[in-house]
């Protein structure tokens, strides 16, 4: 137990004192604000963005020097006549600037890791892609048996997030500033839920960056136990007496954490908890997966250990029902908009020795990914592209747009869904989604022109909708025109793209 505490303290003691002077530099806030409003990843520009500029930010900083900082946020409804923004605009600048500053150490750590490898390094933007997770699952999970499907609880108290930064930010004023920004959007006596609480801090797009940093910092704190256990278990492979004593000593610490009474006759069975070197951990947002080659009993021990350890040391309430034990060969795993499983593909090999011949039955494990068509249709129904049965309907709110704009919107949605679900082994589900979007687009245009769908197609022709029906194979041909003969038929197989950085609302139906 003491060794684990020293490990966590070592991770937390990595301070970056050089960041403190940046908090008081006005150009940091100007740069962070300008970069925040210049980015448009999968989002449309708003009118508020057009009103923002670097000159406005400089004027805001100048007026911040002339006002009492404790009076700025007292009345949010009071509008600043000089700038044309609410007084909440000040907190926006501070939160964006502070989020930019605290991200610097992690960016430097990424640069140092890239410089250490020098050659044969994967580009960082490829590692950031969501699809980069699936090749890892395909290579690793086909050899594993069980996994823990963990749903990380998201209600986090404001003070817990602030306490996470106290280990490496020793400046009290900075911590009070973060606490003030968080409490501005939620009561200090409540917990804020990222996706449900309408008045929560995270729902404010302008402060989402700071919240995501604080939340991920908190998650990384209790994820660090996996690195500690892996380092310990990696040196427990020898059977010498000296290492055996280390095993007993280390298992005693695990026993203290999980509060389990270990008997002598159960020692070898319980030792398997830390003996297993083949553990794989993957997390994206609130979804975490812990897979192993062990048995169901082994995964139950890990479940008990994780729930107890995280609750005692990180104030993270894990209900046991949030962690499911899944057998890969029998059940599907819902992850990142896919249904993943490990299928057994039987194969028969005929062998002959001299005059005798016999058949050998082999079963090869294969990692398979499918598109969950029912939840995807439910997402389309929630966004009014179809009804609950999957029948396409018109989109009345888009009927006032131009024809080209309507077709472009439907086509963009269709291409994004096809692009994201290109890793599916069966493409028939995507054809149904394309059909729903195409007919919904046609009905929207027919509604705008006060005509029927058949009359609309007869008058304008079906080629008007071919823009968003481009297949994945056509996209590959446009991307690699010289390799068209080589890529023929590739679209029927699974394709993982390394340029997908976020999940759309239609895919993230949960």
Curated annotation (Swiss-Prot):
MF terms (GO), sorted A to Z: RNA binding
Highest taxon of the lineage: Eukaryota
Alphabetical keyword list: Chloroplast, mRNA processing, Plastid, RNA-binding, tRNA processing
Subcellular location: Plastid, Chloroplast
Annotated GO CC locations: chloroplast
Keyword Plastid: yes
Main location: plastid
Tagged with keyword RNA-binding: yes
Matching Pfam families: Intron_maturas2, MatK_N
Gene Ontology BP term (one): RNA splicing
Protein family: Belongs to the intron maturase 2 family. MatK subfamily.
Function noted in UniProt: Usually encoded in the trnK tRNA gene intron. Probably assists in splicing its own and other chloroplast group II introns.
Identification of the protein by name: Maturase K
Lineage of the species this protein comes from: Eukaryota, Viridiplantae, Streptophyta, Embryophyta, Tracheophyta
């Amino acid at each position: 137990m003491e060794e684990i505490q020293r490990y966590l303290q070592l991770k937390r003691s990595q301070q970056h004192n050089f960041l403190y002077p940046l908090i008081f530099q006005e150009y940091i806030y100007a740069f962070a604000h300008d970069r925040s409003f210049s980015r448009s990843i999968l989002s449309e520009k708003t009118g508020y963005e057009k009103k923002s500029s670097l000159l406005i930010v400089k004027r805001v900083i100048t007026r911040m020097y002339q006002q009492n900082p404790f009076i700025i946020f007292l009345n949010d409804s009071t509008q600043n006549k000089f700038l044309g923004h609410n007084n909440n605009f000040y907190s926006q600048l501070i939160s964006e600037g502070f989020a930019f500053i605290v991200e610097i150490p992690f960016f430097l750590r990424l640069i140092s890791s890239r410089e250490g490898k020098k050659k044969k390094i994967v580009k960082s933007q490829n590692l950031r892609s969501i699809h980069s997770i699936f090749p890892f699952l395909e290579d690793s999970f086909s050899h594993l048996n069980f996994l823990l499907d963990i749903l990380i609880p998201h209600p986090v108290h404001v003070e817990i997030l602030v306490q996470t930064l106290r280990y490496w930010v020793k400046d009290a004023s900075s911590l009070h500033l973060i606490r003030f920004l968080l409490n501005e959007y939620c009561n200090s006596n409540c917990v804020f839920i990222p996706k449900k609480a309408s008045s929560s801090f995270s729902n404010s797009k302008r402060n989402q960056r700071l919240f995501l940093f604080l939340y991920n910092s908190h998650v990384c704190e209790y994820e660090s136990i996996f690195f500690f256990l892996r380092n310990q278990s990696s040196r427990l492979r020898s059977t010498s007496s000296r290492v055996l004593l280390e095993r007993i000593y280390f298992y005693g610490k695990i026993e203290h954490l999980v509060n389990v009474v270990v008997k002598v006759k159960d020692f070898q069975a319980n030792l398997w908890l830390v003996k297993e070197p083949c553990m794989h951990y993957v997390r994206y947002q609130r979804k975490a997966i812990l897979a192993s080659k062990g048995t169901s009993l082994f995964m139950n021990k890990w479940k008990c250990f994780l729930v107890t350890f995280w609750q005692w040391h990180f104030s993270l309430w894990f209900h046991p029902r949030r962690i499911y034990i899944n057998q890969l060969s029998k059940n599907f795993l819902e992850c990142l908009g896919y249904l993943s499983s490990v299928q057994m593909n039987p194969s028969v090999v005929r062998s002959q020795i001299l005059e005798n011949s016999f058949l050998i039955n082999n079963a090869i494990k294969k990692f398979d990914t499918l598109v969950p068509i029912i939840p995807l249709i439910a997402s389309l129904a929630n966004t009014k592209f179809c009804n609950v049965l999957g029948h396409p309907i018109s989109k009345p709110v888009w009927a006032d747009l131009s024809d080209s704009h309507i077709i472009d919107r439907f086509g963009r949605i269709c291409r994004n869904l096809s692009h994201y679900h290109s890793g599916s082994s069966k493409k028939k589900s995507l054809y149904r989604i394309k059909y729903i979007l195409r007919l919904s687009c046609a009905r929207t245009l027919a509604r705008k022109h006060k005509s029927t769908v058949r009359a609309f197609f007869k008058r304008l022709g079906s080629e008007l909708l071919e823009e968003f029906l481009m297949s994945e194979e056509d996209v590959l041909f446009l991307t690699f025109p010289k390799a068209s003969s080589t890529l023929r038929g590739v679209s029927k197989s699974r394709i993982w793209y390394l340029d997908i950085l976020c999940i759309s609302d239609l895919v993230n139906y949960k």
